[in-house]
Amino acid sequence: MYAHEEARKYFEARNGFTIDDLTLMSVGLTFEFMLQPWLVAPKHDILSSRKEALAKVLGAVSLPIPAARKIALALRNEMIAATKGNLLTAHRPSILRQHPVIQKADGAYIAPIPELLIQRATSGLYYDFIGVDAQGIRQQAARRFELYVQELIPAYLPGLQCLDEQEIGTKKRKFLSPDVLVLNDDTITVVIECKATKNTFSAQFAADLAVGAIRGINELAKGVFQVWRFYAAVRQGIYTEYPVADTLHGMVVTMDDWLRLDTYVRAEVVKEAHRVADKYSEIEPADRRPVVFTSAHQLAETLALTDEQGWYTALTNAATEKYQGYDLSSILEELGVPAERKAFPFNMEEVMPWQKELPK
């Protein structure tokens, strides 16, 4: 999402080091903390030979203990207010997502969950682009997210083809199809709406969703509405560019996984989608089919583990009440669908040019 020149320049100007510095140091630090809990002097050449970059990255991803306590308390108070004291949700906020390393007064560092360093350097890059002056970069990231999904599916399943959104409708009312149209043998089998917007923690876990999570719910509801609108256009014969399968699947793919296991929030999203759809008489009850929600991570994980038949099996079952909130890959596992991990289909050096420097 952010591996392009404008984002790279913004990141370096803001932080004093590059995105490549962050990803390389995060990988090296992850290995270090897995081998030893406390870090004083790095043992790995990747880190010890880049002391200046290491110091800058540690300064950005770490917090001293007093500051960590203060921010953690503020997060907890925010959560208590948002959930009205009902802290039952599994995915709670943590300072370790943005600052996965804690620093002692004597200068030693510890990463309580080393894997979060990798998360901070990948999906966690979002934290570096939340400023008002980065709005254009975020908009570009949203578009790049759509292109990523379009490239990801045929990269893992080469028998499929993905098309960009298309303008459809009548002369009086034109609108866009969902962001991604998936074709199998020139027939549309899946339509996908992509949502790159991230929610705040309080929005994700708020007890009063109408207040706390309205932004996130509205965004996802628009995605569901777009899918339903496409179903209606197909039924009415307005969309005729490609044949459409009778078993057409609708999906909303997010950058976050905060809908995972959360059937209550999911229900609120669908409820809001119905409210929006009620304004359009052409969208009939038959068009309002179940829509599958999944994160980009889960989409990639599922595609890496299965073939076309397995993917369609996962989508069919994910739309049922029984499997609402399940990871797509977990559905395949529960159904006993054979899984065999495929090689990563893209060139990693495009986003991690330092990869060749890692020890074999």
Positions of predicted regions on the chain:
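Interfaces and regulatory segments of ATP-dependent nucleotide/adenylate/phosphodiester-chemistry enzymes
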Residues: M1-Y156, R266-K360
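Short, contiguous acidic/charged loop-to-helix segments that flank catalytic cores in large enzymes
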Residues: G136-A141, T170-K171, A210-K222, R288
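Conserved catalytic cores of phosphodiester-cleaving nucleases, focusing on short active-site segments
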Residues: I153, V180-V182, I188-A196
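Catalytic cores of nucleic-acid endonucleases
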Residues: A196-M251
